[in-house]
From Swiss-Prot:
The gene is CKAP2. The modification Phosphothreonine is found at residues 578, 581, 595-596. Residues 332-344, 361-375, 560-577 have a biased composition (Basic and acidic residues). The keyword Phosphoprotein applies. PANTHER family: CYTOSKELETON ASSOCIATED PROTEIN 2-RELATED, CYTOSKELETON-ASSOCIATED PROTEIN 2. This is Cytoskeleton-associated protein 2. GO terms for biological process: apoptotic process; negative regulation of microtubule depolymerization. It is found in: Cytoplasm, Cytoskeleton. Residues 1-28, 152-174, 208-305, 326-402, 557-581 are annotated as: Disordered. Possesses microtubule stabilizing properties. Involved in regulating aneuploidy, cell cycling, and cell death in a p53/TP53-dependent manner. Its main location: cytoplasm. GO terms for cellular component: cytoplasm; microtubule. The modification Phosphoserine is found at residues 177, 189, 533, 594, 601. Belongs to the CKAP2 family.
Length: 682
């Protein structure tokens, strides 16, 4: 096959083609052309995938027209390359050659395409034009080209999947936030001022931490790109980027030390300017974010030597950019970058001043702040803390006026005289009780004392006097009621009251026992006197006459008993005398007060018939016989074991049991009459 003839426009003069410099130049340009072609091939595949979803199909006529345009553009580029250049151009191309990797990755290839363009107009047109140039060749692919195409497509799929995963990754949480709210205590925990001992180590760590955060893309490639690229295109891109970075700098944490701010600002300025050319010209914002994330991952994996080299290069580039002659776009850049730097300085100074001026909070303030935070969250303590109680105690103490020594002494003297007076009155009452003074006089003195001094009820002696006033014949319930009232009033000391009540109860039991013994002795003495009188007379009496007389006497007693019962049914008020004298000494005849359901029904009938009834209660009154010995023992039993129906020894005690409006129905006791009848038969 014969090689195609070279057009005359592209041929060099024969005198220049033989030179070694031009041969080296052609070899270098051929390498650059092949590399550009490979990168544009991958870019074309990506554009084909995107255009297949909605773009139009390029016809054959359009391809021919675009091919002619590409040839014309190629001739123009060749003419420009043959023009004379300054000596520094070769060095720049060498640096670009070393910096650009041969891997066909999307990020670096796209960046090289954008960087190597010289005019803003051509930068938008070159990708489409060069892609159309390769279209006729793509129809006849060799095996190596097909292999490279497959590898590039696989790599593109991997990169797109990674980019999607990075986009789906959750965002980094805001520092100091807890459940959607920013907590001041969490911010203070990682922004407290460091101690003097750890200043050097902390400063080095923070410098190394802030530099990789700021350098998102690789600075070596972009720095060479800024030197090679045209000034007008670079300055327009950087002016756009400063407006975006000024918003992002507000989110970055302010510098911790003021003396590091100058160096950090210069480094950040250079890095932001160099990284602007890569990120802004890419196209949509989504690609910018993806490229910045991939660049961050590459920067984190780099070694410490690479970081130091990047720092030095960025500083040199920053100094060169500042030293360049000022143009219109450069003036705009400096005007926009200066307020950003001023904001950084002011934010850093304000943060340092606020930390230095902020005093160390006390434990009480911290607790109060914690309580406020808990109240805001809806967490309230069930029991109030002890600190609240301790704060109120001194206030109450301060409210009480502190009296002088003499006033307190006078108050103590008055209190002592007061207690002595009360004790004297109680002792006088006790003496009167022991002497046998009437109950009414002692009650008058006690009531007068309580009227004048109501607090005297809290003394036990008052209740002791009331218990001793009660006669020995009074029931035990009255004394127990006095004891209960003393407990309710809070009398002190209650032990003394308990001892006195025990003494009173023992006295009552002894009195009852003595009375029973005296009655038995008197009865026994009477019987002995009768026996002695019968023996002394010595008169012979017929036993038959004695039996007849005794029978006659018993019959009379039985008749009298029946008459008495009849009289009781007719008019119970006539029976005033107690039947104790008519019975023997070992037994007692008492009246039992009880009710029955039948009696209650009768009462309801009577009340229904007579609306204006004079009585309210209706009870039975039955004479019963009780043993004297058992009666004495049952009196000592508690109320639960005693007989529920009370027994009365006389009619006078009925007024104490019931009301005046109560009515009693007397019914005879056949058992008492039967006793007399049995005695008669024997």
């Amino acid at each position: 096959m014969s090689t195609p003839a070279v057009p005359q426009d592209l041929q060099l003069p024969p005198s220049q083609r033989a030179q070694s410099a031009f041969k080296e130049q052609r070899r270098q340009k051929l390498k650059e052309h092949l590399l550009r072609r490979k990168t544009l091939f991958a870019y074309k595949q990506e554009n084909e995938v995107l255009s297949s979803r909605g773009q139009r199909v390029v016809t054959s006529e359009d391809q021919v027209q675009e091919g002619t345009k590409a040839l014309k553009l190629k001739t123009k580029m060749a003419d420009k390359e043959n023009m004379k250049r300054p000596a520094e151009s070769k060095n720049n191309t060498v640096v670009g050659k070393h910096c650009i990797p041969l891997k066909p990755s999307n990020e670096l290839t796209n960046s090289t395409v954008v960087i190597d363009t010289h005019k803003p107009k051509d930068s938008n047109q070159t990708p489409h034009l060069l892609l159309t140039e390769d279209d006729p060749q793509s129809q006849h692919m060799t095996l190596s080209q097909a292999f490279h195409l497959k590898n590039n497509s696989k790599k593109k799929q991997m990169t797109t999947e990674k980019q999607k995963q990075d986009a789906n990754m959750p965002k980094k949480p805001v520092l100091g936030s807890y459940r959607g709210q920013i907590v001041q205590s969490k911010i203070n925990s990682f922004r407290k001022p460091l101690q003097v001992k750890d200043e050097s180590s902390a400063a080095t760590k923070k410098l190394s931490a802030t530099i990789p955060k700021a350098t998102k893309p690789q600075p070596v490639n972009t720095s060479n790109a800024t030197v090679k690229s045209n000034r007008s295109s670079n300055m327009t891109a950087t002016t756009k980027f400063v407006s975006t970075t000024s918003q992002n700098t507000q989110l970055v944490r302010p510098p911790i030390r003021s003396h590091h701010s100058n160096t950090q600002d210069t480094v950040k300025q250079g890095i932001s300017r160099t990284s602007a050319n890569v990120t802004i010209r890419k196209g949509p914002r989504e690609k910018e974010l993806l490229q910045s994330k991939t660049a961050l991952s590459s920067v984190k994996t780099s070694s410490s030597q690479g970081i130091i080299r990047n720092k030095t290069l960025s500083r040199c580039i920053a100094s060169e950019v500042v030293a360049r002659p000022a143009s219109l776009s450069n003036d705009k850049l400096t005007e926009k970058s200066e307020p950003v730097d001023q904001r950084r300085h002011t934010a850093g100074k304000a943060s340092v001043d606020s930390r230095s001026a902020q005093p160390k909070e006390t434990s009480e303030e911290r607790k109060a702040r914690l309580n406020e935070w808990k109240a805001g969250k809806g967490r309230v303590l069930k029991r109030p803390p002890n600190s609240v109680v301790t704060q109120h105690e001194p206030e109450g103490q301060n409210e009480k006026p502190v009296g002088s020594f003499w006033t307190t002494m006078a108050e103590e003297d008055e209190q002592r005289l007061f207690t002595e007076k009360v004790n004297n009155t109680f002792s006088e009452c006790l003496n009167l009780i022991n002497e046998g003074c009437p109950k009414g006089d002692i009650l008058i003195t006690l009531n007068d004392l309580i009227k004048n001094i109501p607090d005297a009820k809290k003394l036990v002696k008052y209740w002791i006097c009331l218990a001793l006033i009660e006669p020995i014949t009074s029931p035990i319930e009255n004394i127990i009621a006095i004891y209960e009232k003393a407990i309710l009033a809070g009398a002190q000391p209650i032990e003394e009251m308990r001892h006195t009540i025990v003494d009173i109860l023992t006295m009552k039991s002894q009195e009852k026992a003595n009375l029973g013994e005296n009655m038995e002795k008197s009865c026994a003495s009477k019987e002995e006197v009768k026996e002695v009188s019968i023996e002394d007379t010595g008169v012979d009496v017929d036993p038959e006459k004695l039996e007849m007389e005794s029978k006659h006497h018993r019959n009379l007693l039985f008749q009298d008993c029946e008459k008495e019962q009849d009289n009781k049914t007719k008019d119970p008020t006539h029976d005033v005398k107690t039947p104790n004298t008519e019975t023997r000494t070992s037994c007692l005849i008492k009246y039992n007060v009880s009710t029955t359901p039948y009696l209650q029904s009768v009462k309801k009938k009577v009340q229904f018939d007579e609306t204006n009834s004079a009585f309210k209660e209706l009870k039975f009154l039955t004479p019963v016989r009780r043993s004297r010995r058992l009666q004495e023992k049952t009196s000592k039993l508690p109320d639960m074991l005693k007989d529920h129906y009370p027994c009365v020894s006389s009619l006078e005690q009925l007024t104490e049991l019931g009301r005046e409006t109560d009515a009693f129905v007397c019914r005879p006791n056949a058992a008492l009459c039967r006793v007399y009848y049995e005695a008669d038969t024997t």
